[in-house]
Amino acid sequence: MELKMKLFEKIFAFILSKFWKNKNFVYINSNKKNLNIESIKSLVKPSDSKILNCQTNKTASIHSLKSHFVKNKIYLYQIQKNIRDNYTFYYCGFPSQMFSIYDGYVLGNTQYPKFLELGSNEKFYSVDFKLKIKKSETENVSDSEEINLVIETSYIIDKNKLKRFPTYYFKEKAPNKITGEYLNKVYNFTKSFLDKCNGYKIKKVNLYITSKPSVSYVVGTAIQTYHPNVNVYEFMNNDFAYYLNLNKGRIEK
């Protein structure tokens, strides 16, 4: 997927991409809170893997979201330029769902990472994911130009906070420990639902999601360029005021 970047951002990212020496890497994307790199080192093989540390912890404003997103894109550009099929790639962090979805949207056709998720015991564990495409049965959608898709894999979203459009749900809660099987279920639902939208006059899908990073990332990989435009909403200051327009690669209000 082509990144939408300003020219000076792309030039800076291009220069950084030329200094890669290690083919194996860990991509940490975190803007909710910082991830302690020491807490994941025992899971990373080989141990000398390159660390791509895209971390900030200020999320109280549209400015902070946009600032992190610029940093996010610079790392994604470097990954796109350097990743190969035989590379080992880890993904972890505490990002806004919009950012992990964007990561999956951009990198999904490149290679799936090993996900590092934080367990209920406050220790990280590794999740291997191999895509198994299977058509998922989804309900029929109304012939509306704009709809809502709500993916609730952790907590329930207040429906009164949603935009007033026909709304469709994925409500299967994630297991305590994320598995490849569950990630495939989420992927196949998302892709099948958006594929079905193509048969109607739907032009825009408002996506609201509660999920761990691995789930959000896989949702992003399921979204294709031929699908209706997807806007991923961010819950901040008790409202869904801001969203990431995936097609434009831009945070909007």
Predicted regions and their residues:
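Long, low-complexity, Lys/Arg-enriched
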Residues: M1-Y208, P213-K253
